[in-house]
């Protein structure tokens, strides 16, 4: 912070040697202070400009914005919010005040939402703010799904821009919904724009009329009724009972549940990792009464028996896990010092210890693991960036004995629910901006190696338990919710409420049990 005496001189207008004017109002300041923070003022006062010795400088900005920026140069303090960040950024970009530029960019990333994503995307294009563009683009499909009134009121130019931005990253039905919903608000007036909107979508309507294009899109959106599929599961097994640690069998269709067993430790066990293999649930690592532990327990669902397994070779909490090829992999997580680790451990029944596997590309915890195309993938998670906890958008996969990076998620997020459903990889919900749950659902496209937005769950949730049950994708619980939802490939619907064990990396699987 600039020394207090200089700030006092500024407030009193003492020893000032330059006058800044905005909207006809003047602010007296010191060239030295302005030059120390602004490259624009430094070059102006020290270069060969005609204004070098001018005592009055006019700025094309509102008075409040100019005063706030000058106040920042004396105090390094400024209040940014969604009502002033754009005007502040425009001015400091012109004045070349790098620390405040960075501060504004950080604020943009926290205030962008469905309401302002179109406007901020255009603002980001004007100043080439790549991260803001990415976040604003990510929210556009959510605007289509969750902000119908705002969509109907959108201008043709804004809708056209949005279609161009989302057409390659969302399921086609979402883009078609945006077009038809917008036209239906005033069919007589808006239907004539259907050919133009089809072009924005990447379609080639040729000589087709706007009426024909609109009719075709309405027809394409009709949902075909699928044939009835016989049930081959009758329950989902997961760890329920909130913090009570009860292995529970749930019938998702009726909401009825049966407690199969309660684990044996009396201590408070949390932050452990659960994984399923061959009707056996394994619980590894975590903390007992807040103390890191390496213990591993297993519960045989069919035999209703508990067993101790070899301890982990390292302390591990909030790790991801997946079982494949008869092996269990424990991936990432926090070490004994609560720092994300980049190590992988593996074990199979019959081994007397855990072995070290390939090293992750990025140390990560609170990530989600899934098997996709016979490879283990981990999506997002929490990292330490320059020693500061943060979330990541990095996706990694274990291929040929080596972890490699895959195209990143739409935005950084942790505690997502990763599920393969109908041979497609889905990423449901998660926690963004540290601990804010989201209801975004994205799907990986193998043809473009990109993630596409395919809808939103009814409830925002992070850290939910998920599995496929009788040809539908289910998610249970999550951050601050006991709700569950199911997805048939077209729409999400609320299902029966459940009580999942939180403060852990839980797991669930569908099976058939004689209850």
Swiss-Prot record:
Q: Which UniProt keywords apply?
A: Kelch repeat, Repeat
Q: Which domain of life is it from?
A: Viruses
User: Which organism's genome codes for this protein?
Assistant: Myxoma virus (strain Lausanne) (MYXV)
What CDD domains is this protein classified in?
A: BACK, BTB_POZ_ZBTB_KLHL-like
Q: In which family does this protein belong, per the annotation?
A: Belongs to the poxviruses Kelch family.
Q: What PROSITE patterns is this protein classified in?
A: BTB
A Pfam family that this protein carries is Kelch_1
State whether keyword Cytoplasm applies: no
Q: Which SMART domains match?
A: BTB (SM00225), Kelch (SM00612)
**Any idea what this protein is called?**
Kelch repeat protein M-T8
What region holds the BTB domain?
16-82
Kelch repeats span which residues? Answer: 280-326, 328-374, 376-423, 424-471, 473-512
């Amino acid at each position: 912070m600039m020394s207090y005496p200089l700030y006092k001189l500024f407030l009193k207008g003492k020893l000032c040697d330059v006058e800044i004017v905005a909207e006809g109002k003047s602010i007296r300041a010191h060239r030295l202070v302005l030059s120390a923070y602004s490259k624009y003022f430094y070059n102006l006062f020290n270069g060969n400009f005609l204004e070098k010795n001018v005592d009055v400088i006019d700025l094309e900005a509102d008075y409040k914005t100019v005063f706030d920026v000058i106040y920042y140069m004396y105090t390094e303090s400024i209040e940014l919010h969604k009502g002033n960040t754009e005007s502040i950024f425009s001015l400091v970009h012109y004045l070349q005040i790098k620390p405040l530029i960075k501060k504004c960019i950080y604020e943009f990333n926290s205030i962008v939402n469905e309401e302002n994503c179109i406007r901020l995307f255009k603002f980001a294009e004007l100043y080439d703010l790549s991260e803001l563009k990415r976040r604003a683009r990510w929210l556009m499909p959510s605007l289509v799904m969750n902000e119908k009134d705002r969509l109907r009121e959108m201008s043709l130019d804004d809708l056209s821009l949005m279609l161009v931005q989302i057409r390659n990253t969302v399921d086609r039905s979402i883009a078609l919904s945006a077009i038809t919903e917008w036209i239906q608000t005033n069919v007589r007036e808006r239907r004539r724009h259907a050919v133009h909107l089809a072009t924005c979508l990447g379609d080639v309507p040729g000589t087709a009329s706007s009426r024909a294009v609109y009719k075709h899109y309405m027809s394409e959106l009709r949902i075909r009724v699928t044939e009835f599929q016989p049930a081959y599961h009758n329950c989902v097994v997961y760890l329920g009972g909130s913090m009570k640690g009860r292995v529970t069998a749930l019938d998702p269709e009726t909401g009825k549940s049966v407690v199969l067993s309660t684990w044996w430790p009396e201590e408070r066990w949390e932050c452990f990792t659960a994984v399923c293999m061959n009707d056996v649930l394994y619980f590894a690592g975590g903390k007992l009464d807040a103390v890191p532990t390496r213990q591993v327990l297993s519960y045989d669902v069919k035999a209703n028996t508990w067993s101790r397994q070899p301890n982990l070779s390292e302390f591990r909490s909030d790790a991801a896990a997946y079982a494949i090829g008869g092996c269990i992999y424990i991936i990432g997580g926090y070490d004994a010092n609560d720092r994300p680790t980049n190590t992988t451990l593996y074990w199979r029944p019959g081994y007397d210890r855990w072995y070290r596997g390939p090293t992750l590309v990025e140390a990560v915890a609170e990530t989600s693991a899934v098997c996709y195309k016979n490879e283990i993938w981990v999506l997002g998670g929490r990292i330490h960036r320059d020693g500061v906890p943060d979330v990541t958008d990095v996706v990694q996969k274990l291929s040929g004995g080596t972890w490699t990076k895959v195209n990143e998620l739409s935005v950084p997020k942790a505690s997502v629910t990763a599920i393969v459903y109908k041979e497609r990889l889905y990423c449901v919900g998660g926690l963004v901006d540290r601990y804010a749950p989201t209801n975004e659902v994205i799907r990986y496209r193998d043809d473009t190696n990109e993630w596409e937005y395919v809808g939103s769950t009814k409830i925002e949730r992070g850290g939910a338990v998920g599995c496929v049950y009788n040809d539908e994708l289910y998610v249970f619980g999550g951050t601050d919710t006991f709700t569950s939802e199911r997805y048939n490939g077209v729409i999400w619907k609320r299902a029966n409420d459940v009580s999942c064990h939180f403060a852990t990396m839980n797991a669930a699987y569908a099976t058939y049990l004689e209850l």
